[in-house]
Every structure is written in C-alpha cells, then in structure tokens.
Amino acid sequence: MNKGYTFITQSSLETKKIAKSLSIFLLKSKNTFAKAPIIFLEGNLGSGKTTFLQGFSKAFKIKNKISSPTFTIIKRFKIPKKLSTFENFYHIDCYRLKNEKEILKLGLEEIINNPKNIVAIEWPEKIKKFLPKKGIKVHFQFLSLNKRKIKIKINV
C-alpha cells in the first residue's frame, strides 16, 4: 500500500484527531505486519510531533501522558491486551543522540523487529541507516501559532 494524505490543522485538537485516525487504521490492520509498524515523524522543533502522538495513543487506551522522551530517548507504553494484538507502543526521540550507533545500544533492532510493537520515531533521519524503507512518514510544517500542515505517506 502506498498512499498519501495532506491536512491543514487549525488547533492541537485537530492534529490529535488526525493522529487518532491513523492509530485506528493500524488497529484495524489486525497486526498483519512482519515487523513493527514504524511511524517516522519529521518536522522542526515545536511543529506538532508530540501533540500528534498524544492523539495517536488515545485509540490504544494508553493512560500515561505522552511527552517527548528527549533525554531518555526511548519510552515504552503497554497497550491493553483486550484492545489489540499489539502489546507495546514505543516513542523514540533521536534529537539528542550523539551518534547514530548509540541507538543500537538501546535495543532498536529488537524493538523494530517485533511485530507486537508499534514504533514512533522523532528525528528518524539521524538513524536512517538502521531503519527500514517502509513505514508511515508524517511530516509537520509550522504555518502559524496553531496552524500546521501535516503530510502522511503510508508505505507499508
């Protein structure tokens, strides 16, 4: 599947609704992935990546507040078993990585090779040589204080 969508959002609430729709798409896929589905989040600081993931996590009934794991780099959230065959949602923020190999020491290969995981990666360009070509690219463009352009390209 190779599809693209473009949205203009006027608020963080609209951004979260688009993200929730994407997570519902993954839930309906019934986990037919050979490896973890990966969401590549691209955009400048403050462009809406973390806000998007807050909306994304709602459909998976994740109760923890989603915040950017800039200093911890990787955060794992359990997905309730009755909801999905997915078990974990990983939020990875590569912004502060000193070098690309640092991510391997944190278990990236195991995380992305497990089809029971869903993985969202901020700043994926910093570790692109370790990532698969297929995935869901979400690009954020800051237009004004609350307005964003969000382009989603699904290539799974």
Where do the language-model regions lie?
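N-terminal pre-Walker A segment at the start of P-loop NTPase domains
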Residues: 1-25
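Short phosphate-coordinating micro-motif centered on Lys-Gly-acidic
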Residues: 1-5, 99-103, 108-156
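Phosphate-binding P-loop
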Residues: 2, 25-36
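Hydrophobic anchor at the beta1->P-loop junction of P-loop NTPases
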Residues: 39-41
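The conserved Walker
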Residues: 45
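Conserved lysine of the Walker
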Residues: 49
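Short beta-strand-centered segment that lines the nucleotide-binding/catalytic pocket of NTP-utilizing
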Residues: 62-77
